[in-house]
């Protein structure tokens, strides 16, 4: 029977006893009430999720504790729930988990229940609630929190021993046992990455894990760090799933996008635009070509990664301009080929469309306008089928026009008669200003027989003129597929010093050993160690230093 119901039963029974007038007066030992209370308690213990008590009740118990008043069992449970609670009436007071004065008393209360085997599941759930609710990005730096973690792990065994039959919630806790260890989140993250079915929603309810818990951050940190352990084809297969996670977990969306884009940049696919990844990045972070958005991008990814996406957009715009927006002429493959060579150097591109392109209701045009909303301008002053393309390379803006017979115009940034981000541009006043352009080049003589390594005709003249402006064609960097199984000797220089004490220990541990070391932490990845042959001594030491084993890859370990 719960303490409240038991007290009520005793008070009513005592009142009736004292007011009894004769032998015929109603006698009632309240068996039905006691039975109902017992049934309620059993149902409570069977429940998958134990509801969190109101903050008002938790704070009342915390205040009684600080006033050194004697607490009932129920009040102690409220204290266990409130170890991470801030009291708005006393903003200068630390939470109990950070209170060196009062936490020892709480610690003794928990230890007493553990030693006497009287810790109930509701008490254990209350401790779990505080453990996961503690607001600290690195909770392990708090020794009181670490003590609590140990009590919860021990307390589970006490609770389990008191239950005759194993409950479904117990199986979930035991499967995700690492949540009460320094390796918290490892099992869940590996399970998620492997695409295995999981009981994450059940765990969230059973272990009283709030949405704001440090555990979710830990899970995603571990999960995203493991992307670096995947080979490129494996990673490519995971991108759609990662984008699904980004849509589902808004709180970690930026972290997921940062890790995915960075990993893609370091893959062999870098120069191949990933349509879904590009669209998601534009939706969440806007256009990296716009000056107003570049600071936002640089909050999340390095400049080379942002440049990769800008290159994707430039290639996309060039393809659309010379194919979809060719006006009333044929596709100019020569101009498309020439400018694609510079796409990876283009920091900004803008398509300026005439009336026909804006009003065309063909499915290709409708889709194009929808996907590029906010990235298109209106062209006035020309023929309805005219379109223009603005490209920024280094300090210059280059303007091409749809259809043949138009020269290319180039302007120095800061001296151009137009703002390339303007919503409306005039073909004659802005884009074809002979007096302010630094270059005006026709597309003659005709270019024929060109290929990836050879240019002909007018392209040769263009290359010469661009070199005078300090612009040279740079072949796209060849990115080799790295076989993670390949063997190479380990040396101290393979490991960068980021955490001096730990990284120096790792250097000395792997030096001269038969293993492969890959340190990509400065690129947002992980430090991984693959032992070529089993070595129990080294593997134990790696675990002690905080490394985690890689799922399905024996003798391989990683650390962030």
From Swiss-Prot:
Phenotypic effect of disruption: When this gene is missing the Zorya system does not confer resistance to SECphi27 in E.coli.
Top-level taxon in the UniProt lineage: Bacteria
Keyword Ribonucleoprotein appears in the UniProt entry: no
Effect of residue 443 to A: No longer resistant to SECphi27
GO biological process terms, semicolon-separated: defense response to virus
Keywords of the record: Antiviral defense
Pfam family, one: EH_Signature
Function: Component of antiviral defense system Zorya type I, composed of ZorA, ZorB, ZorC and ZorD. Expression of Zorya type I in E.coli (strain MG1655) confers 10,000-fold resistance to phage SECphi27, 100-fold resistance to lambda, and 10-fold resistance to T7. While most T7 infected Zorya-containing cells undergo abortive infection, a minority produce viable phage progeny. These eventually accumulate to a high multiplicity of infection, leading to culture collapse by 2 hours after initial infection. ZorA and ZorB probably assemble in the cell inner membrane and exert their effect there.
The protein, known as: Zorya protein ZorC
């Amino acid at each position: 029977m719960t303490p409240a119901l038991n007290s009520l039963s005793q008070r009513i029974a005592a009142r009736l006893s004292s007011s009894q007038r004769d032998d015929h007066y109603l006698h009632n030992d309240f068996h039905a009430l006691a039975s109902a209370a017992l049934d309620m308690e059993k149902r409570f213990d069977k429940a998958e999720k134990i509801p969190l008590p109101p903050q008002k009740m938790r704070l009342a118990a915390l205040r009684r504790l600080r006033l050194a008043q004697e607490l009932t069992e129920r009040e102690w449970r409220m204290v266990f729930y409130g170890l991470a609670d801030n009291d708005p009436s006393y903003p200068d007071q630390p939470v109990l988990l950070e209170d060196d004065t009062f936490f020892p008393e709480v610690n003794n209360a928990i230890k007493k229940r553990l030693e006497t085997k009287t810790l109930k599941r509701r008490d254990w759930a209350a401790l779990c609630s505080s453990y996961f609710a503690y607001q600290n990005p690195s909770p392990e730096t708090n020794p009181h929190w670490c003590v609590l973690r140990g009590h919860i792990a021990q307390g589970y065994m006490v609770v389990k021993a008191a239950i005759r039959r194993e409950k479904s919630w117990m199986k979930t806790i035991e499967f995700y046992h690492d949540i009460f260890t320094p390796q918290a989140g490892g099992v869940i993250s590996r399970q998620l990455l492997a695409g295995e079915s999981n009981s994450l929603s059940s765990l969230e309810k059973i272990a009283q894990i709030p949405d704001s818990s440090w555990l979710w951050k830990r899970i995603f940190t571990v999960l995203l760090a493991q992307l670096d352990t995947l080979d490129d084809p494996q990673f490519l297969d995971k991108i759609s799933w990662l984008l699904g996670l980004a849509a589902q977990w808004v709180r970690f969306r930026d972290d997921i996008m940062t890790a995915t884009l960075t990993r893609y940049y370091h893959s062999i696919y870098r120069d191949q635009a990933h349509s879904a990844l590009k669209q998601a990045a534009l939706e969440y972070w806007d256009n990296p070509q716009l000056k107003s958005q570049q600071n936002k991008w640089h909050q999340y990814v390095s400049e080379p990664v942002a440049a990769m996406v800008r290159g994707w957009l430039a290639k996309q715009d060039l393809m659309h301009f010379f194919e979809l927006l060719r006006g009333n002429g044929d596709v100019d493959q020569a101009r498309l080929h020439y400018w694609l060579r510079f796409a990876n150097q283009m920091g900004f591109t803008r398509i300026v469309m005439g009336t026909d392109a804006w009003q065309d209701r063909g499915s290709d045009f409708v889709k194009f306008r929808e996907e590029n909303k906010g990235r298109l301008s209106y062209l006035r002053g020309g023929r309805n089928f005219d379109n223009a393309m603005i490209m920024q390379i280094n300090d210059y803006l280059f303007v091409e026009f749809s259809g043949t017979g138009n020269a290319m115009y180039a302007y120095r940034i800061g001296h151009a008669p137009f703002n390339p981000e303007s919503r409306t541009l005039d073909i004659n006043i802005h884009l074809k200003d002979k007096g302010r352009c630094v270059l005006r080049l026709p597309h003659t003589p005709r270019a024929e027989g060109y290929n990836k390594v050879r240019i002909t005709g007018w392209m040769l003249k263009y290359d010469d003129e661009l070199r005078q402006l300090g612009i040279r064609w740079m072949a796209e960097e060849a990115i080799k597929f790295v076989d993670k199984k390949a063997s190479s000797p380990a040396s101290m220089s393979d490991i960068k010093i980021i955490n001096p004490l730990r990284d120096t220990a790792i250097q000395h541990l792997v030096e001269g050993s038969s293993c492969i070391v890959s340190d990509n932490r400065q690129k947002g990845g992980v430090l991984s160690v693959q032992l070529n042959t089993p070595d129990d001594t080294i593997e134990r030491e790696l675990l002690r230093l905080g490394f985690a084993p890689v799922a399905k890859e024996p003798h391989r370990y990683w650390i962030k």
